[in-house]
A protein has these predicted regions:
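Pyridoxal 5′-phosphate
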Residues: 1-382
Length: 382
């Protein structure tokens, strides 16, 4: 039996169609897209076609005088840091939450070291940002303004948060839609977001590339100065990665409704099976946010009394790939901050692990995962 991969929130398999598009672009457009000769112009055309296609698929403005900008980066982490550090005006307040990716949290810490007032907003029990606390922060920011980070789908729990109606001109919003891009129909032009981050390795695309979308008229200080990417990100662009990015997003968009429906059904079946397996072992099972709005592909599961790291390691030895948390924080032995922010019992917090499904997850994968975890629980108890 091969491995059962249930860590799609960390990374997804590269789609064959995407690999084919990247291979072809490598063959025909190998030149530097900044070069002025014919080969360079061909590479530049493929790069710009990919940029415009991605921008169109996320609902950005691609025509007229107010075209939105899409900056290719090395990944979502760089894009998040560019947004947070580059959009923070002098004297502005910074607001983040336990929902946010570690790259946003670390950027906020850096801004605090530079003298900005930074607040970690509390969450409601459904995982959404506390609106009263946010209103207080906006009021305290006054004329200096507030830079707010939002994460529509939390990568640890799958819990959703909805877009907020905030005072125009007083709040700059950076949205990290890295988890949401494959599962939600995005309309950047109609949103209140100033900037937005996404990366294709979450939906069958390549690693090593991400994108930051920014409004046309918003000043932003580059993290890596240079002449490329509208002067907002230095370094020779990776044309094949951009082509793969666009193709992966195109496929994910076309298949979104069908895949979301099927994956949610599989996730629900998995959760029922894990609750039954826990009961058979004489344990309780908790599904974090089970009755709250959630993304279809993520389940945060807790078996109080069972160490999450031991469980994930035991499952791995049996052939099931799970996670204790977000891959970008996997070096830490501490539970995810959102679990503390939800004010859960310590026994739940320290036993929570993540199962995340994707387009390639099958009925057989779910059945086998349930049986593997049933065996792991039985051995841990007895």
């Amino acid at each position: 039996m091969g491995s059962i991969y249930l860590d799609h929130a960390a990374a997804t398999p590269l789609r064959p169609e995407v690999a084919a598009a990247m291979t072809e672009s490598t063959r025909v457009a190998f030149a530097n897209p900044s070069s002025q000769h014919a080969a360079g112009r061909l590479a530049k055309r493929l790069l710009e076609d990919a940029r415009e296609r991605i921008l169109d698929l996320v609902g950005g403005r691609t025509a007229g005088t107010a075209r939105d900008r899409l900056i290719f980066t090395s990944g979502a982490t760089e894009a998040n840091r560019t947004a947070m550090l580059g959009l923070a005006a002098k004297g502005c307040r910074i607001a983040v939450s336990p929902r946010d990716h570690p790259s946003i949290q670390s950027a906020a810490a850096e801004l605090a070291a530079r003298g900005h007032a930074v607040r970690t907003l509390p969450l409601e029990t459904d995982g959404t940002i506390s609106r009263p606390a946010l209103a207080d922060d906006i009021e305290e920011a006054g004329e200096h303004g507030l830079l707010l980070a939002v994460t529509p789908i939390c990568g640890q729990t799958g819990l959703r948060d909805v877009e907020m109606n905030l005072p125009e001109g007083r709040v700059t919003i950076h949205a990290d839609v890295t988890q949401a891009a494959a599962w939600d129909a995005l309309s950047y032009a109609d949103s209140s977001w100033t900037s937005m981050t996404l990366a294709p390795h979450k939906f069958g695309g390549p690693r090593g590339i991400g994108a930051l979308v920014v409004r046309e008229d918003v000043p932003i200080t580059p993290l890596l100065p240079g002449s490329q990417e509208l002067g907002l990100r230095g370094g020779t662009e990776a044309v094949p990665l951009a082509v793969g990015f666009a193709r992966a997003l195109e496929l994910a968009t076309q298949e979104r409704q069908e895949v979301s429906t099927r994956v949610q059904s599989l996730r629900d079946r998995l959760e029922v099976g894990l609750v039954e397996a826990a009961r058979d072992a004489g344990l309780q099972a908790t599904i974090i946010g089970r009755n709250a709005p959630r993304a279809p592909h993520i389940s945060a599961v807790s078996f109080p009394g069972i160490d999450r790291q031991s469980l994930v390691m035991a499952a791995d030895l049996e052939g099931a790939c799970l996670a204790t948390g977000t891959a970008c924080a996997s070096g830490s032995s501490e539970p995810s901050p959102i679990l503390f922010a939800l004010r859960l019992d310590d026994s739940i917090i320290h036993s929570t692990f993540r199962v995340s499904l994707g387009r390639t997850t099958s009925d057989e994968d779910i059945a086998q995962a349930i049986e593997i975890l049933r065996g792991v629980l039985s051995r841990h108890v007895h």
